[in-house]
Structures are given as C-alpha cells and as structure tokens.
C-alpha cells in the first residue's frame, strides 16, 4: 500500500507533498504522486456532430477537434513535468520509494478505483480550479471526503510540523475505526494527542472514551481525554486552538453530535474554518 498525494498547480500542492512526506515517514510507506486530468486526453472536449451538414462547418469542426487534441497533449506534458518536479522534491526530503501517475478522470474516481492500494490519501483543501476564497472547499475535495473508503488528509495551505493532535471522538462506529487505525499505525506516535468528546454535559465523559484512551496508550501513544460542550464545530476547533494542535482527526459516522461533523453542514463548516490540516475517516474498510 501507498500514501497517495494528489497534486495540481494550486497553492496547496507544496503542502500536499510535504504532508505526504510526513505521513510516509511516520508510517514507513511509499508515496505515489498523482495528477488528475479531468478531461480525457483521447476525446474532444466538445460535441461537434451537428456541424456535419455543411463543408465549411465540417472544416471548422475538424480544426476545433485538432486544437482540442493539441491542448490535451499540452496538458499531459505539463502534468508529467509537474509530477517530475514534485517527485524530485519528495526524494530530496528523504523518501526513496516514490512513484508517479497521471490519471484522466476525477480524483474521486481514482481513489475509489485504487482504494485497495491506498493507506492514506492527501489532498489540498482546494484545487487549481476552485479559486482562492478560503471560505469555500473545492467541490472535488468535498466529494472525495464524503465518498472515500480510505482516510483523507485535507491539508492546510502551508505545512506546519505536527507537534500536537486533536481527535474528535464519539461512541459511533467510525470513531472506533479511527481509534483502531491510530492504534495499528504509528501515525501519531511521539505526538501528544487529545481525545475530545462533545456533548451537552462536558463534565460527564462516556466510559468508552477511557477504553479508547487505554487502547491508544497501549499502542505507544501519549493521550489525554477532554470533554467539551457547545456547537460541535466550535467546540472541536476551540480544542485545536487551546492545545494548540497542528492536526485534527475526525471520524464520520457516529450516532451522537459528532455524526454531523463530516456528513452534514458542520463538516463543511469545520473544514472551511480550520486553519490546521484535517484527517477525515468516512467509510474506512
């Protein structure tokens, strides 16, 4: 399995590969750098079939198809140059096991088709076509987060060394899978981590959170538990600020208030507002 690093020419590209390097070093896994071309290079981007009635329109159609094909060849060449440049940076950062892939389709399609070869997917909060407004997520990123069967690390614009982490925890299945992953893989070993539970009564913690803490500590992690109250996104992000943490980890499917963290509007709000990178577990399998 590999760490998938999805890169493009957005301002997040450098942060993506730097986070991927950090994950790869923590877990001792190779990196695959992937650049996705939304428009297949083998087909024209527009349908000109209606122009067949007239010779001059037929000539115009053929010229436009030729230009489309030329544009696609340019995009492929530029994509390969991007992959080569980032692969060189990754190797200079100390990762020797690096592969590259140019994929024609969508990011979500690639991850779904190759989930069995991926341990963690690393993506930027917004792609090169999403604009620069920090209040919005790229539509492709939101689609990936909601459908992925692998943990997705949505990175901040700049890489900051991970010295502390916050795990948003509830009693649902997804949080259990998150704890299992963190106990099995040394991603947060050596990094003080807070398990944070949000409820109406911050003083009353479920007994299961102590079990989760013990499970993680047995695996070698340094863990504390914390109860919070209030709106979920506000409470979690405040815990991140208070730590202060450079990484937030959140499961997706629970039956408590954390449930809305990743499957409803609260998730979008949290990802938009978070100034740190967020590792999201949705349907880990």
Residue ranges, per PLM feature:
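Alpha-helix-centered segments that form part of catalytic cores
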Residues: 66-88, 98
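A short, acidic, amphipathic alpha-helical segment used as a generic capping/interface helix at domain edges
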Residues: 213, 231-242
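Gly/Ser-rich helix-loop-strand patches that form or flank binding pockets
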Residues: 13, 17, 26, 100-159, ...
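Conserved active-site histidine-acidic residue motif and adjacent donor-binding/catalytic loop
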Residues: 105-108, 228-234
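Small/aliphatic-rich secondary-structure junction motif
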Residues: 1-65, 147, 160-227, 245
